[in-house]
């Protein structure tokens, strides 16, 4: 039966680097990603998968059962956790066998999870800005939840559409006596292979780095200009901004290395040493970025007082009394941030 391995170094990032090399007279020693992968990737992916799935399932439980989904930010946070779960589900299969359908499924889950996470981070940031700008009166109470649901559906649809190019061009290919899910241009696609590799790289950089960085920077600068921002500090503002900052810090190194690897001829980085270092940088930064799914639940626990309270009660760390679901808890235990700071 045909087997393939989907590993972080097997995606089009490193493949681009290798296939776009110009024919050089000197023989270059290519970076051997398998050496590091054999030692680190299985244990790292297993740890990230277990921790990330448990953390994000706990977030889903608390949001759905206890905090409720009557606030727009909770709807976005729930979808953000689902995005992380989609991404995490691909990790165990980076070193396991499968067939052509499995390749498509893994590619779809991986990129849909990544793109949707980016979009929900942007939606959270914009929502916090609108709350701050309009003091919670931008929408009526009856329109808040429907607006959150509609924008969430649009975010998922956009993420799926953004993933279609990867879904089409990835196929199992024989490499090192086993099949790997890698870039392979389909004959019916227009333009040449180099064009599509450049296109996929730019799409990745714009969606995962440029777009969220622009939105975050622009809105944060606008908020910093007001006196009210310095006078009023709410934990949810800190939480949303921390989520975005961590996401950018985790994925920016990989996107930069990925971009330089793809367009290295344009930056005079085609020599042996530069190519080797770029391959290594892409591989290592990709592994680091993979761990981002475990960070968000930790931010909730440290920066969201309501979430940490529910979390502690779930584990009976502060109280042995049963935690009541939303709508049944007493006023003293269900108090969250003031309405003018948390609702749109």
Curated annotation (Swiss-Prot):
Q: Which CDD domains match?
A: 7tmA_CCRL2 (cd15171)
Query: Region Disordered: start and end of each range?
Result: 324-344
Gene3D superfamilies reported for this sequence: Rhodopsin 7-helix transmembrane proteins (1.20.1070.10)
Membrane-spanning regions, if any? Answer: 44-64, 75-95, 105-125, 145-165, 199-219, 239-259, 287-307
Superkingdom classification of source: Eukaryota
Family listed: Belongs to the G-protein coupled receptor 1 family.
Put simply, this protein is called C-C chemokine receptor-like 2
**Which organism's genome codes for this protein?**
Homo sapiens (Human)
- Gene symbol here is CCRL2
